Swiss-Prot record:
Gene3D superfamilies with a match to the protein in the record: Glu-tRNAGln amidotransferase C subunit, N-terminal domain (1.10.20.60)
GO BP: glutaminyl-tRNAGln biosynthesis via transamidation; regulation of translational fidelity; translation
Record function comment: Allows the formation of correctly charged Asn-tRNA(Asn) or Gln-tRNA(Gln) through the transamidation of misacylated Asp-tRNA(Asn) or Glu-tRNA(Gln) in organisms which lack either or both of asparaginyl-tRNA or glutaminyl-tRNA synthetases. The reaction takes place in the presence of glutamine and ATP through an activated phospho-Asp-tRNA(Asn) or phospho-Glu-tRNA(Gln).
EC number assigned by the record: 6.3.5.-
Name assigned to this protein: Aspartyl/glutamyl-tRNA(Asn/Gln) amidotransferase subunit C
Length: 94
């Protein structure tokens, strides 16, 4: 599939781009390559792709794991209180 220089100029105009003549030729070739690649993708059989696709996420077993120690977690906290991160108040009490 090819794209004409006029089509590239039209696309550039719609995109509010000003292209020089050598850029028109360059982008014409680039768009042609992209369209050829898209055509190749369209040729791929959908049945082969559907086998690899799953619309659900496999679940892992819910097993307890060791977590980080509170002291280590709060080492780099700018402010802490009662073993928790302290953050600035953003909601007025009234």
């Amino acid at each position: 599939m090819s794209i004409s220089k006029e089509e590239v100029i039209k696309i550039a105009k719609l995109s509010r781009l000003e292209l020089k003549e050598d850029e028109v030729e360059f982008f014409s070739a680039q768009i042609k390559n992209i369209l050829e690649f898209v055509n190749k993708l369209n040729e791929v059989k959908a049945e082969l792709l559907e086998e690899e696709y799953s619309d659900s996420t496999p679940l892992r077993k819910d097993e307890p794991e060791t977590s980080l120690e509170v002291d280590k977690v709060l080492l780099n906290a700018p402010a802490k209180r009662l073993n928790m991160f302290e953050v600035p108040k953003i909601v007025d009490a009234n």
